């Protein structure tokens, strides 16, 4: 099957934004204008095409990044047909894992900002993730029709808060109720969209006289940004020559792809203005798969051996599985991005991470929650596969004859956990299946059984995250469950070095005895270093074959520390000495000796409890600033700064222990009459004050 769209005309883009910047509405309009959707879905009615899980429709927030394919020939039909693969990403902090995961497979992104709210806390998180993966991006200022809308204030915030380098390629005509359209700085014409056709038709008009000076000033800035792309253009510009439209577009495109600038546009998706021009900007400025460096990977058996794959149909096949979803009709769907080569349904692919070959069953092209079966996928495509049993998020799929491991994604450790128990015996079995399915879909969600209580414990990135997963368990799997109170994921570590601590396991009870003896030194590591074991045994005082047993004994003890039974982190153990018995020594005895030595060393090394600290940002009207700050301080929070919001009001940034943040949304609502909002994400672990540590230990019954 021949390629319908040349790869140069592919655009793999993400639409991402803070909650309520209108991202889902913007995506809906894109689907409408590109002719896929014939009736626009409104988030207000719970009918938006991209928000396809029931909870999303009820809550009006986007949870799952649905992947959609659409086609665009330009708003005036003046471009050859381009193929957009659009990934809708969630804007809520509890779902940053989804955003991070989609950034990994995108070539470019459209960042949507609210013209009133401006750069909000989550926008900064998303921006950091886009920087991490080097994703070129456009900025689209939405909701220009709302009271308090201010395009130029958002421009200033992009520069100051995100350290971005925005280059407006349009400026608004009017704002709030008077927002009529935009001045296109490339054409130096006003664009006015026709309301009757929902913005499908438009016309170019002369720039309104009162805007001419503003348009001239911003065009000059845009041309100057373009001229900085190369010395030749700069000479031409400084010599007073006009740059052609094509030169400006190419120069801005080159600088956007190099992540030096971000073209900036505006509109109101809800009123059908401006999104069409943004789609043209996606063609003009964002990269195709061949405009960015080839994807990098490593050899399956040698991490030092670097490999790469070009975005070309004739290369060996390589793809990355970036999302797993359970679909009520076809079962498990694996979304994957093809970086190189091509593959047909029925072909065998190799998963080097799991070291398994699998047959690719059906391949589906997704449009939000509708699907079309296709036979072949090519370089640059994003599709979903049915029938891959072993693949999980972040796995590579490749040609069995040419293995490559594309980089692994690193997922954050969960910070909050809850006990969950089925309401009836019938729910028991279903709950196990449901939790395993959900954990396969979402690497930031973990399930385990508590050995002491026998309870099932679920852990995730925040209260909303777990709430939604429990909700899905009920809807998709019919499991009724009771949820315990949220528990904080504390950790334990040490502050001092404990030298030459011994563990001796001796058992003589008729017949063959047991004998293991290990001496260790335990010392703290810097935060985040994890556990390290060093074998410093000299002269064979412990035989080689027993040393792994000592390490295993220690590793098995790490999940339950001595203070309150929380996992021990960031410690280094050096095995320095020991002894053995020719007859009675065995692996089990040395495992016990290692465990005993470690527990004893922990007691001597000033053990402390660590608690998760959260970066909290509260957006509040100015009148409540004092109240909010006072409340954060009473929660042991440290206020770290304050910013102004575009439409008035303040953003308060603070670091607060997670244990103090339960029920915060209700408290904040009542303290500010529902006018303040907040976001929170995990920052780092810090030592808990003595009184808090004692309270936690008492609650755990381990004083």
Curated annotation (Swiss-Prot):
- Keywords carried by this UniProt record: Cytoplasm, Elongation factor, GTP-binding, Nucleotide-binding, Protein biosynthesis
GO molecular function of the protein, one example? Answer: translation elongation factor activity
Localisation per UniProt entry: Cytoplasm
* tr-type G domain location: 8-290
Primary localisation category: cytoplasm
Q: Where does GTP bind?
A: 17-24, 88-92, 142-145
InterPro entries in the cross-refs: EFG_II (IPR041095), EFG_III (IPR009022), EFG_III/V (IPR035647), EFG_IV (IPR047872), EFG_V (IPR035649), EFG_V-like (IPR000640), EFTu-like_2 (IPR004161), G_TR_CS (IPR031157)
Task: Indicate the segments annotated as coiled coil, or none if absent.
Answer: none
Taxonomy, superkingdom: Bacteria
Q: Which Gene3D superfamilies match?
A: 3.30.230.10, 3.30.70.240, Elongation Factor G (Translational Gtpase), domain 3 (3.30.70.870), P-loop containing nucleotide triphosphate hydrolases (3.40.50.300), Translation factors (2.40.30.10)
> Could you mention a single GO BP entry for this protein?
ribosome disassembly
GO CC, sorted alphabetically, is:
cytoplasm
Which family does the UniProt entry place this protein in? Belongs to the TRAFAC class translation factor GTPase superfamily. Classic translation factor GTPase family. EF-G/EF-2 subfamily.
Describe its function: Catalyzes the GTP-dependent ribosomal translocation step during translation elongation. During this step, the ribosome changes from the pre-translocational (PRE) to the post-translocational (POST) state as the newly formed A-site-bound peptidyl-tRNA and P-site-bound deacylated tRNA move to the P and E sites, respectively. Catalyzes the coordinated movement of the two tRNA molecules, the mRNA and conformational changes in the ribosome.
Which PANTHER family does this chain map to?
Answer: RIBOSOME-RELEASING FACTOR 2, MITOCHONDRIAL, TRANSLATION ELONGATION FACTOR G-RELATED
Any idea what this protein is called?
Answer: Elongation factor G 1
């Amino acid at each position: 099957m021949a390629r319908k769209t040349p790869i140069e005309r592919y655009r793999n883009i993400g639409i991402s934004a803070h909650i309520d910047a209108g991202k889902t509405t913007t995506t809906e309009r894109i689907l409408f204008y590109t002719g896929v959707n014939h009736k626009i879905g409104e988030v207000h009615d719970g009918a938006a095409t991209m928000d396809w899980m029931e909870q999303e429709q009820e809550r009006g927030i986007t949870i799952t990044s649905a992947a959609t394919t659409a086609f665009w020939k330009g708003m005036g039909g003046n471009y050859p047909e381009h193929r957009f693969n659009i990934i809708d990403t969630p804007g809520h902090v509890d779902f940053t894992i989804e955003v991070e995961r989609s950034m990994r497979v995108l070539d470019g992104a459209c960042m949507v900002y609210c013209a009133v709210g401006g750069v909000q806390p989550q926008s900064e998180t998303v921006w950091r993730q886009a920087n991490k993966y080097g994703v070129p991006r456009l900025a689209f200022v939405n909701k220009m029709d709302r009271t308090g809308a201010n395009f130029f204030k958002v421009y200033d915030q992009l520069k100051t808060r995100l350290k971005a380098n925005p280059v407006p390629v349009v400026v608004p005509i009017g704002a709030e109720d008077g927002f009529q359209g935009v001045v296109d700085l490339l054409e130096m014409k006003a664009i006015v969209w026709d309301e009757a056709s929902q913005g499908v038709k438009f016309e170019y008009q002369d720039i309104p006289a009162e805007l001419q000076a503003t348009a001239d000033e911003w065009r000059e800035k845009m041309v100057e940004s373009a001229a900085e792309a190369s010395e030749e253009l700069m000479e031409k510009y400084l010599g007073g020559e006009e740059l052609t439209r094509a030169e400006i577009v190419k120069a801005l495109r080159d600088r956007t792809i190099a992540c030096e600038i971000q073209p900036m546009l505006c509109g109101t998706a809800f009123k059908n203005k401006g999104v069409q021009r943004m789609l043209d900007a996606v063609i003009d400025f964002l990269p195709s798969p061949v405009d960015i460096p080839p994807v990098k990977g490593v050899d399956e058996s040698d991490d030092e051996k670097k490999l790469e794959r070009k975005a070309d149909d004739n290369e060996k096949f390589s793809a990355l599985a970036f999302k797993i979803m359970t679909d009520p009709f076809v079962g498990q769907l694996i979304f994957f991005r093809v970086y190189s080569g091509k593959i047909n349904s029925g072909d065998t692919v190799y998963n080097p991470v799991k070291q398994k070959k699998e047959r690719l069953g059906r391949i589906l092209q997704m449009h939000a929650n509708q699907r079309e079966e296709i036979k072949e996928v090519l370089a640059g495509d994003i599709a979903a596969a049915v029938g891959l049993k072993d693949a999980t998020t972040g796995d590579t799929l490749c040609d069995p004859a040419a293995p490559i491991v594309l980089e692994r994604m690193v997922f954050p450790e969960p910070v909050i956990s809850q006990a969950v128990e089925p309401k009836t015996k019938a729910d028991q079995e279903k709950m196990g299946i449901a939790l395993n399915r959900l954990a396969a879909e979402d690497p930031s969600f973990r399930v385990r059984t508590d050995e002491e209580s026998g309870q099932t414990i679920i852990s995730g990135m925040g209260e909303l995250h777990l709430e939604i997963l429990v909700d899905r368990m009920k809807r998709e799997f019919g499991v009724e469950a009771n949820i315990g109170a949220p528990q904080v994921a504390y950790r334990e570590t040490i502050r001092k070095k404990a030298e030459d601590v011994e563990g001796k396991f001796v058992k003589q009870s008729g017949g063959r005895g047991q004998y293991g003896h290990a001496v260790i030194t335990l010392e703290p590591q810097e935060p985040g270093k994890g556990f390290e074991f060093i074998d410093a045994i000299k002269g064979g005082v412990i035989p080689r074959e027993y040393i792994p047993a000592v390490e295993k004994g220690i590793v098995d003890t790490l999940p339950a520390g001595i203070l309150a039974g929380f996992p021990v982190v960031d410690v280094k153990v050096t095995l320095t000495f020991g002894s053995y018995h020719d007859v009675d020594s065995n692996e089990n005895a040395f495992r016990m000796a290692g465990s005993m030595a470690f527990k004893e060393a922990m007691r001597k090394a000033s053990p402390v409890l660590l608690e998760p600290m959260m970066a909290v940002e509260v957006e509040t009207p100015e009148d409540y600033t004092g109240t909010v700050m006072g409340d954060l301080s009473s929660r042991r929070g440290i206020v770290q700064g304050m910013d102004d919001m575009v439409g008035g009001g303040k953003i308060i940034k603070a670091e607060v222990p997670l244990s103090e943040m339960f029920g915060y949304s209700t408290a904040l609502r009542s303290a500010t009459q529902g006018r303040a909002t907040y976001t929170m994400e995990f920052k780092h672990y810090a030592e808990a004050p003595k009184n808090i540590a004692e309270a936690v230990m008492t609650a755990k019954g381990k004083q």
